[in-house]
Regions:
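Conserved, well-structured ligand/cofactor-binding cores
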Residues: 20-195
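A cross-taxon signal for low-complexity, glycine/charged-rich
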Residues: 3-5
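Aromatic (phenylalanine/tyrosine) cluster motif
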Residues: 7-10
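Intrinsically disordered, low-complexity polyampholyte segments enriched for Lys and acidic residues
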Residues: 13-16, 25
Length: 195
């Protein structure tokens, strides 16, 4: 079962990639519905490209989340992980003049993974899973961040992510820091299958 799958339309005919060779791939829309395991595997295997919803409602949802965080920052509100540390450091407030620097510093701090690197397929699964989570509209991220993750998947520019590193409630801070590091140009990536 592939959820959210659409086919590119040429005139009156809907076609899939098998009908026209390697010219295009089917597109999986990520954001309005949860992805199935089969969806994640298909994107990881590069059987599908991904896209974000075009609906006004979805785009407004994403913008409202980002606007909410921006307003809370202007009001100098306390936002876990934005104006505070993470985990046991959640009670440590970050001075407002350092708030914009915190995400970069946290990605560097948590970039302490060990072990073998995840293979390209597994790293792609990590990226599409995070994209799906963020694109649901509950995280306050910008549309431009989501668009960059879509670009990474569709262009097959995927962060190199070590296989070991996180322990904790979510267990994902270390691997996700490698996505953030790649987004700002500070981490290695797989480009066309090679590091």
């Amino acid at each position: 079962r592939i959820s959210g799958l659409i086919f590119i339309s040429f005139g009156q005919n809907n076609v899939n990639a098998s009908q026209i060779g390697s010219m295009i791939k089917p597109i999986l829309i990520v954001g309005e519905q949860p992805l199935s395991i089969e969806d994640v595997v298909a994107v990881a295997r590069q059987e599908f490209n991904v896209a974000l919803p075009e609906t006004t409602e979805w785009r407004e949802l994403i913008q409202r989340g980002a606007d909410f965080l921006d307003q809370l920052l202007l009001d100098e509100g306390v936002i876990y992980g934005v104006t505070t540390g993470y985990g046991d450091s959640c009670l440590v407030e970050i001075p407002m003049h350092q708030v914009n620097e915190l995400p970069l510093q946290l990605s560097r701090f948590h970039g302490c993974g060990l072990g073998e690197n995840l293979d390209l397929l597994t790293a792609r699964a990590v990226v599409v899973t995070r994209l799906c989570s963020l694109a649901r509209g509950y995280s306050g991220v910008s549309l431009s961040l989501l668009e960059r993750l879509v670009w990474m998947l569709n262009e097959n520019i995927i962060p190199v992510i070590p296989s070991e590193g996180s322990v904790g409630a979510s267990g994902d801070l270390t691997p996700l820091s490698y996505i953030a590091g790649a987004l700002v140009g500070e981490r290695d990536v797989y480009a066309q299958g090679k590091i």
